[in-house]
Regions:
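Conserved, structured core segments of small domains
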Residues: 1-139
Length: 139
């Protein structure tokens, strides 16, 4: 079965949903409901044998690239300072098809935000590249 990475883009949904404040400014009960939903998703995936891993991420990000043979790495807080998008977390899933990955991504996007309203996060669905199966010589 193919594996997919579901990348959760916080503050990347349609107007006005991308204007939700950062989670550290949510009411405690809203944070608890959001985390409970994430656990619920993981449990559903585990029950179906589709769960591989999941993780939440902090909003702090550092972009790094090779600086050259005798140079230090180049770092920045992001190549696109005009965007307020950040990757808030991810699920790695092992599912039957791309259609199933999209179905799960849509469900994850409905996760509750402040006041219990859906966040409408954009979920980036990325198939994991697989290694070519080993071949045997018939000679």
């Amino acid at each position: 079965m193919p594996k997919y990475l579901l990348l959760k883009h916080y503050r990347g949904g349609p107007e006005p949903h991308h204007l939700f404040p950062p989670m550290d400014r949510w009411a405690p009960e809203d944070v608890e409901a959001h985390i409970a939903f994430q656990r619920h998703v993981a449990e559903l995936l585990e029950e179906r044998g589709e769960y591989v891993a999941a993780q939440a991420l902090t909003p702090v990000q550092t972009w790094v690239r090779y600086g050259g043979p005798d140079a230090a790495p180049v770092t920045t807080d992001g190549p696109h300072p005009e965007t307020s998008d950040l990757i808030a977390g991810w699920f790695m899933i092992d599912v039957e098809s791309h259609e199933r990955a999209v179905e799960l991504a849509a469900y994850v996007s409905s996760e509750p935000g402040p006041g219990g309203e859906p966040l409408y996060e954009w979920i980036d669905v990325r198939e994991v590249m697989w290694e070519r199966p080993e071949t045997t010589d018939a000679a």
